[in-house]
Amino acid sequence: MGRSLKKNPFVANHLLRKINKLNTKGEKEIIITWSRASTIIPTMIGHTIAIHNGREHLPIYITDRMVGHKLGEFSPTLTFRGYAKNDTKSRR
């Protein structure tokens, strides 16, 4: 279930301050954040945000197609290492 349209999208205050500061300066630098729950808003377009996945920060370039999604959707936390090998054939 999505968030109510009466409410504004959630964006962490510290992240919003950093983006607004870079927009006023006109600079582009990597913004490091742990806030995976923040929603991508149009003022973030064109910035590179390094999102924490539990182990490291993955740099993600924000495009216009990402608006409305959460930051955490673009930094996977689990790595698939393959299914467990079944050794029943070698035991026979």
Swiss-Prot record:
Protein name, UniProt field: Small ribosomal subunit protein uS19c
Primary localization class, coarse = plastid
Cross-referenced InterPro entries, in alphabetical order? Ribosomal_uS19 (IPR002222), Ribosomal_uS19_bac-type (IPR005732), Ribosomal_uS19_CS (IPR020934), Ribosomal_uS19_SF (IPR023575)
UniProt function note:
Protein S19 forms a complex with S13 that binds strongly to the 16S ribosomal RNA.
Q: Which Pfam families match?
A: Ribosomal_S19
| GO CC terms | chloroplast; mitochondrial small ribosomal subunit
The gene name reads rps19
One biological process term from GO is:
translation
Q: Which family is it part of?
A: Belongs to the universal ribosomal protein uS19 family.
- Give one GO molecular function term: structural constituent of ribosome
For this UniProt record, give its keywords in alphabetical order, as a comma-separated list.
Answer: Chloroplast, Plastid, Ribonucleoprotein, Ribosomal protein, RNA-binding, rRNA-binding
Upper taxonomic classification of the species? Eukaryota, Viridiplantae, Streptophyta, Embryophyta, Tracheophyta
Compartment annotation:
Plastid, Chloroplast
